[in-house]
Regions:
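M16 family metallopeptidases and their MPP-like homologs
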Residues: 15, 23-43, 60-116, 152-175, ...
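Short, flexible, solvent-exposed loop/turn segments with mixed acidic/basic and small polar residues
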Residues: 80-82, 189-196, 305-309, 403-407
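Short amphipathic beta-strand starts and helix->beta connectors
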Residues: 11, 71-76, 180-192, 297-304, ...
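Glycine-rich, mobile lid/loop segments that gate access to catalytic sites or pores
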Residues: 140, 144-148, 159, 163
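His/Glu-rich zincin catalytic helix
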Residues: 1-71, 176, 189-293, 330, ...
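Short, low-order "capping/linker" segments at domain edges
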Residues: 142-146, 242-256, 359-368
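Acidic/histidine-enriched alpha-helical segments
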Residues: 64, 120-144, 231-239, 335, ...
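Short, polar/flexible loop-turn hinges at active-site or ligand-entry regions and domain interfaces
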Residues: 53-56, 97-101, 120-129
C-alpha cells in the first residue's frame, strides 16, 4: 500500500493511497514549523481557536452540526511534536464514496469544510473573534495548571527539559501561564495569515478517488499558496558524560522516577528497527525486562516502562515507586539496560518483542489514521518505506543489532518526584 506523490498547485504536496479497503476515507493537511519559544504556544492556541467558528459556520456547534449531517463526518485540528518540529494540521474522516452514491462521495464537501477551518475562520472586524480567544486562553491556563495533577507525565516532562535543555525539544508546546496574557486577537490573526500564505503544506488522502482528481480538487478548494517549506531538521546528539540529577517534592504517596537516555539513532538510521526492538524488550510491554524483572519479580515499583521517540533519538523510563526504594530501583533499571548491552535476551523476551512489532505493522494496514501518521512522518524526513518493508526489517533484526543499538544509548538525566505522604493519604490514581 504505497502512496502516490503528486504536486498540488505550485508548491504543496499530496500523498495519496487509492483503495476501497476501508469503509471510511481520510484527508489530512499538515504544516511543519520549527518549535520556537516565541511561537509554540501561539500556534497551539491558534489551532484550538480555528475550530471555534468559521465564516460560514460562526459557532463551533454550527460547524460540527453540519459535519453530523454529512453522515457523522469529523474534522480534528491538531498541534503536536515531531522531534524539534511542531506539526500543525487537521484530519477529516468521512464515510467512503461507495456508501454515499459513488463518484467522489463526500470528498468535495470535506475539502470545503477544511477550507472553512483553515482559510475562512470567523473574522469579525477582520480579526479572530476576541471572545473566542479569551475562552481558549482560560482553557489553556487550566491545562497548564493541571500538569501538576499528572505526576507521571510531570516527571517525564521535567526529565525531558533537563535532557534537552537549550533545544527546541525541551519546550512545552502549550507554553507557560505567564505568557498567555500577551497573546492578542490581532497577533494571532497575523500568525494565521503568515502560516496560510507563506508555508506550503503536505496533504494525505486515503480513499477510492483517483489521486489526480484529489490533487485537482485540493488545488481548487484549498489554495494554500505558500512557497516556503521549513527545513524539518532535528538536532541529534549524545549527551555529555555527566548525568544530570534533580529532585522535587510533592504531596504524593509514591515517588515518580524518570530516567532519560539520548541516542544518535533516529528514524532514518539503519539501526532504527533494532532500536524499536530494544525498547520493546527493555520496557515497552508486559513481557519486557523492566516489567517482568523490576516490577514483577523484585516488586520494586508500582509500574515501570520505557518509551521511544525515534524523531528525536530518546528513550524515557518511568517508574512509580516507594520513596525508600529509589536507589535500588535505579540500579535495577541500569542492570536491565546493561543486560541489553551484553545481548542477554531470553527467548521469551525475544519472541514477545518480535510478535509485538509484527502485530503493530500488520495493524497499521487496518487503520487509515495510523497509515497517515506513518507515511507523513517518513515523507517529512525523506524516507521511502512501507509498513510491509518495516515489518520485514523487524523480522530481520538480530540480537547483535539490538546490542549494537544499546551501545548508542547513553543515560543523560534523572528526575525524581519525591512523595511526602504516608500510604493511604494520597490519591489512588497517582
Amino acid at each position: 500500500m504505497t502512496p502516490q506523490i503528486l504536486r498540488v498547485g505550485a508548491h504543496a504536496t499530496l500523498l495519496a493511497v487509492q483503495t476501497d479497503r476501508f469503509k471510511s476515507e481520510l484527508l489530512n493537511v499538515q504544516f511543519a514549523v520549527p518549535t520556537k519559544e516565541k511561537t509554540a504556544q501561539r500556534y497551539a492556541l491558534l489551532f484550538e481557536l480555528l475550530r471555534r467558528g468559521t465564516e460560514r459556520y460562526p459557532t463551533k456547534a454550527q460547524f460540527y452540526r453540519h459535519l453530523d449531517d454529512l453522515y457523522a463526518s469529523d474534522i480534528r485540528p491538531y498541534c503536536r511534536r515531531a522531534g524539534d518540529m511542531q506539526l500543525l494540521g487537521a484530519t477529516a474522516e468521512f464515510l467512503g464514496a461507495r456508501f454515499v452514491g459513488g463518484g467522489a462521495g463526500l470528498l468535495p464537501e470535506m475539502c470545503e469544510m477544511l477550507a472553512q477551518l483553515l482559510l475562512h475562520p470567523y473574522l469579525p472586524n477582520n480579526e479572530l473573534h476576541a471572545p473566542y480567544l479569551e475562552s481558549e486562553k482560560r482553557h489553556l491556563r487550566d491545562t497548564i495548571r493541571a500538569r501538576i495533577n499528572n505526576p507521571r507525565g510531570y516527571a517525564r516532562s521535567e526529565c525531558r527539559k533537563m535532557l534537552f535543555a537549550g533545544e527546541p525539544y525541551a519546550l512545552s508546546l502549550s507554553g507557560e501561564e505567564e505568557s498567555i496574557d500577551a497573546i492578542t486577537a490581532k497577533g494571532l490573526t497575523a500568525l494565521w495569515q503568515e502560516l496560510t500564505t507563506t508555508l506550503s503544506p503536505t496533504f494525505f488522502y486515503i480513499g477510492n478517488t483517483p489521486p489526480e482528481a484529489v490533487a485537482a480538487l485540493l488545488e481548487r478548494t484549498l489554495p494554500l499558496a505558500g512557497d516556503q517549506k521549513n527545513p524539518t531538521k532535528t538536532l541529534v546528539k549524545m549527551p555529555a558524560d555527566t548525568v544530570l540529577r534533580r529532585e522535587e517534592e510533592m504531596p504524593l504517596c509514591q515517588g515518580k522516577l524518570a530516567i532519560g537516555y539520548r541516542t544518535d539513532i533516529t528514524l532514518a538510521h539503519r539501526l532504527a528497527p533494532a532500536m524499536s526492538m530494544l525498547n520493546e524488550i527493555f520496557g515497552g510491554s508486559a513481557a519486557s525486562k523492566l516489567f517482568l524483572n523490576v516490577r514483577e519479580k523484585r516488586s520494586l515499583c508500582y509500574h515501570c516502562s520505557s518509551s521511544l521517540d525515534l524523531y528525536k533519538g530518546a528513550i524515557f523510563v518511568g517508574s512509580g515507586i516507594r520513596v525508600e526504594n529509589r536507589a535500588v530501583t535505579e540500579q535495577a533499571i541500569r542492570t536491565e539496560f546493561e543486560a541489553l548491552l551484553r545481548g542477554h535476551i531470553t527467548e521469551t523476551e525475544w519472541d514477545a518483542a518480535k510478535r509485538s512489532r509484527d502485530f503493530v505493522c500488520r495493524q497499521l494496514l487496518d487503520q487509515p489514521a495510523a497509515l497517515c501518521d506513518f507515511y507523513m512522518g517518513r515523507h517529512m524526513l525523506g524516507i521511502s518505506e512501507t509498513p510491509e518493508q518495516r515489518r520485514a526489517a523487524f523480522a530481520a533484526v538480530t540480537r547483535d543489532e539490538v546490542a549494537e543499538a544499546a551501545s548508542h544509548l547513553r543515560e543523560g538525566a534523572v528526575f525524581f518526584l519525591k512523595g511526602t505522604l504516608d500510604d493511604g493519604e494520597g490519591d489512588e490514581n497517582e
